[in-house]
Amino acid sequence: MLSVRISARQCSVRGLATQANNVSQPAKDNATNGSDAATEKKGTARYQRIQPSVALNSLKTKLSNDFQKQQPAQKIYSQFQSDLQQLISEQQVNPRHFVNSSICNSVLAKLILQSKSELDGQSIGESASIPPTPFEILETYLKYNLARHQHFIIVLKQFLIDLQPKEAINLWISFLEHAKQMPLNNTGTSQVQALTSIAYLMLSKESNSAPDVNVLTQLLNITPSKVPFLAIEQEIKSLGLTATTKDELLKSFDDLLLQWFTADKDAFINEFLKNSNDLKLITYLWKQYLKLATKDFTTSNQEIPGAFMIKLAQLDRSLDAVKIMTQLKEASADFKPSVSLYNSLLQTVAYIPAFGKEAQSIKLNRIQAIWNSYIKSSGNITVASYKAMLEALIIAGHFKTVESFWTLDVPDDVKANSEISDIYLKNFFASVKKVHFSQLKSKIPSKVHNLELANTILLAMVHSDASVGDIDSFYSHTFQSTEGIKPNDKTLAIKLRANLAAFGDSKNESILGTIGLSANSPTATLVIEEFLKICENEESATALLKALNIDNKSNDSAKKVSNFLDYYLQHGNWEYAEELFKKYLTDNVKSPSSVNYRLFNSMFKGFSELSITRNDTGFVSKQQVYWELCQRIHNRIFNECVISTLKSVSALSRRNAEFSENELDFINNTVLPYLVKLKIENSFKLQNPKYLQNMKSNDKIHIPKELL
């Protein structure tokens, strides 16, 4: 077993963490220096300027003391405002330096909650003064760059409980205006979006208008795939609304979902379902469709249930997918399977795994059983069914059977259908590996109108012994002629792969220039990502990295380098990935914050996957190195890095792995306390409770009570 425990041999990597002490921090903003640094009028004392973090810690301490004294909200709030003014006017603390701090998050949330409690009639302290409203307090936080997601959430909830949806919508607009000035918090943003969605449902009810997903997505400024549907239902149930209001909102939410499912089926299937990989969301939406859309699946051609079947199968839930047929029958006695649904079932069974020597035969038998029993027996086989059969055979890996089916079973008039012939040709060019170009040439159509097919042909040519001239000729004819197809990122990546073989070492040449891109083009990063997906070996990846000669100080360098980090870590070459990371850190020694979340996420995720696939706890020690470095550079750990670390520890704990004393110390005294801190700040929500459940199986790991 490979062990990667930190040792003297690897001290250069450990040095990444210790080196951070010597890395100069970002230059302090000089806006408050010079002419802005004021001295008091003649005869008064000069005030000493203090650091923003010191100022915020002072505010936090004062607020905490006021809460311990059980002072009323109005008194605490007034003193808080006075203290802020003093910091700004006398000690010259610029509020814009508060933007990225989380020091006061929890105590500021407590002030809003106390004002809410007092307004609800719960007397606190000795004063009977009228407390400030939560919104009034939030406005002050916004003024001084202290507002965070959790503060918006508290006020939004209060507006909804008070049945003030218009005020909630106005607050959402304010949130959008200030979101870029707050630390990144995807969990908090999702919750704010969910609460805003509830406000929209309330307004729809008030105006007697049917809720519409298109209107909601315009309001939230996101695509339907980003709407937090799960959170919306959970928030409706947990807000503490009256039973009547809650039931009305749940009914409106059901109407919203049904409208989304059925108003524009093509958009739901092609723009959302085919592009989403969120298994939890898709499973939830299927259950909702089954509950709400009886009329749709008993009167239509059932394209939506079929699309759910295929998507679940693609997400490795093929057994759940085939159960959909039974669920539909149980949901309504009026349900009768359509040919369209059987076409989807064909593709679904192709995803079901099979094992043993007869695995391929088993897969083929399943497909043929559906074809013969439900489609061929109907006597009228449509183009859609031939298409589904071809795709099912390709999914199952029966490339030779595709050839025989095409030759013996597909009628000539169907073969003439461009959609069908494109599928057949894609199968042919995708299945051939490193053959002579002469074997491909006769199959290449004179005109290609399908982008996916064109890319498949181009890649097959690159893998063959086709000359540079042959490849350039096909590329020019297919993509650069007046009637040509517009190339996508994958097209450019394949052409880049072809050009790389003939690329010289001249510093005057640019490898990206050979495909018409500049080094700083936004498309360049996407093309590099696609290149690494089609890259057949590490030598090609390294050749591209060398040819790119990435400037690690450029604006988009982190995106590019993180793609290579992902690639090398996925292929097990973590040593080279660390070399790239260390070089990036060295090149940015004067601005270490340039080593951003993308790079750290890549390292944490890569080590997480390696720890699991190799069952080696030593990679947790690697995560510790980057945890310490990230903390020193950014004063925080990015959420994805936290998740990757928890995933490692969870999987290894489930396998009864033995952690070293150093690793246990890291888990118990660094990772878990940090998770508690995030929970208190409401800046992170652990979506998979199994992580902690698995960790509990190790009696040397102590889960804090706050996380149980």
Curated annotation (Swiss-Prot):
Coiled-coil regions, chain positions: none
A cellular component term, taken from the record's GO annotations: mitochondrion
GO annotation terms (biological process): DNA recombination; meiotic cell cycle
Location within or outside the cell: Mitochondrion
UniProt superkingdom: Eukaryota
Primary location class: mitochondrion
Polar residues bias (residue ranges): 19-36
Assigned keywords, A-Z: DNA recombination, Meiosis, Mitochondrion, Transit peptide
InterPro entries xrefs: TPR-like_helical_dom_sf
Annotated region described as Disordered, given as residue ranges: 19-44
Transit pept. (range): 1-15
Role of this protein: May be involved in the control of meiotic sister-chromatid recombination.
Protein name, UniProt field: Meiotic sister-chromatid recombination protein 6, mitochondrial
Organism phylogeny: Eukaryota, Fungi, Dikarya, Ascomycota, Saccharomycotina
